[in-house]
Amino acid sequence: MNFEKIEEAYTLLLENVQVIQNKLSTNFYDALIEQNGIYLDGQTDLEIVKKNHQTLKSLKLSREEWRRAYQFILMKGAQTEPLQANHQFTPDAIGFLLIFIIDQLMVASDITLLEMGSGTGNLAETILNNSQKEIDYLGLEIDDLLIDLSASIAEVMGSKAHFAQGDAVRPQVLKESDLIISDLPVGYYPDDQIASRYQVASQTEHTYAHHLLMEQALKYLKVDGYAIFLAPNHLLTSPQSDLLKSWLKDNASLVAMIAFFSM
């Protein structure tokens, strides 16, 4: 991996985003999506963007170099236009720990992986670029902005990732997967009617969205598959935890829990 090339790519991408942002009077993230579209189809009257794209293509970045450049771009955007907490990308330290766990757990060399709440796609690309496994990946994401970001970035990178838009809590037509992962969005799910279909549903308040996603995930998991969730440390002690533990006892085998301590 060439860090000088990553830095140059970051500089070129940032200039393009800023030029497009000023031209279209739009926000940072929509400008980034637009820049990705221009990179792919070459249709623009912005000469500086065309020139920068020629330079970008001459760098011949690897997929991991592209990922790092986009990661820095998203971090730059967050300085002026912060994403909500549930939309921020999973840190690399956790991503690489997940890769180690996946490579150790999964026996087969070819696996299918479903990510529920794929966000910006950074975790997906971290895994696809660095795992020893051959992975058939699908990411499911409800947010319009995030699905456009992740899909356009993946196409620029030449990634094998596929993304679909949908509410992961609602029923989806998906094939069963060997592995399911989710950096769980934490909070309440607003639709009590949908939530009432689940065993983890609360009868007294909105149900935790992360509990619903865990239950839903197992519906798409092969019998001998694994689900890996990044969850809050108070998962098993929160007010609705008894509902979750009751469901876990009847429907899943808990292999391990790893706690990350915050400073």
Which residues does each PLM region occupy?
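Mobile active-site "lid"/loop adjacent to the S-adenosyl-L-methionine
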Residues: 183-213, 234
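Conserved SAM-binding loop
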Residues: 150-151
